[in-house]
């Protein structure tokens, strides 16, 4: 039985990946999930798998070398899938040090512990071991307003926020380990994810939640910044396929081919909520474009992201299966069915943060 060590598995993408892997492999694999359970980590995301005999949760910070070394010492880890990261640009602008510590130092700890566990006396590595570092397209910077411009694996790094700079630094550490030690690893750089379990500081769940509660829908700047949207289950599938079929030491871009302006996303959510809510639901009456409120633009706000997933399609056969219209309906339906989840995660610290970011502007 292959054993996976998943970091940040209680977060949005990590928990969706764990669900995907158990749906696909069931009892053929074992997953150890390491998460510090900071504000965006939520064990409710994993209540459907927590009683499985082949699932283990360990509360630990990836910066804690002793805790991570202990996991490797007590388990024969075959694969590391490294999601754990601070990931919200707005928070990075307010508290950049936290992002450097988790994203850079934490990745260094994970690499060192995996290397120590997997390296043989002659400097080679045990057969079948692999470290997959999950990163972002934001490391590439911003694209011009040109529909023919895309990020490729060869695009030079040009990060513009503390978040993207910290992720670029972590990518470079992984590249250095691959080059220096021939460490068995891959890097994936993905576009914006959306889907179930996403913490509502991110655009899509924020807009869904605010619209359902009749609150303003904040839009940075002119709302014309473009992002490429990737349904999270498609991303989970891509990560699994890179683990199984990806060439060692390679980077693969994972994009959704769903490029849309932020304001367009908001209009689509409003229209979809209107379509999906029954006329008898009193919330339907107040969900309209009047809720849209333009706020001061984010510092260093990149204008356009768009990924060309040509390499992963050609080498591995992965491509995004979920178009945005389908994905947003599935996402909204999930939030309809899990309103208790949303209510739980939007209380306390989140509400304080939301007020600081949007209500005071």
Write out the residue ranges for each language-model feature:
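Loop/helix-junction capping segments adjacent to catalytic residues or to phosphate/diphosphate-binding pockets
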Residues: 40, 65, 197, 263, ...
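Tryptophan-centric aromatic hotspots in well-structured domains and transmembrane helices
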Residues: 39, 88, 99, 151, ...
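A glycine/serine/threonine-rich, flexible loop-to-helix segment
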Residues: 49, 147, 200-208
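C-terminal substrate-binding subdomain of Rossmann-fold SDR/epimerase-dehydratase oxidoreductases
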Residues: 16-20, 24-25, 31, 60, ...
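Residue-level recognition of oxygen-bearing side chains
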Residues: 67, 98, 105, 199-203, ...
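Residues at alpha-helix caps and immediate loop-helix transition turns in enzyme cores, especially N-
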Residues: 17, 42-45, 95, 199-203, ...
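N-terminal Rossmann-like NAD(P)+-binding domain of SDR-like oxidoreductases, especially those catalyzing
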Residues: 1-193, 243, 272, 338, ...
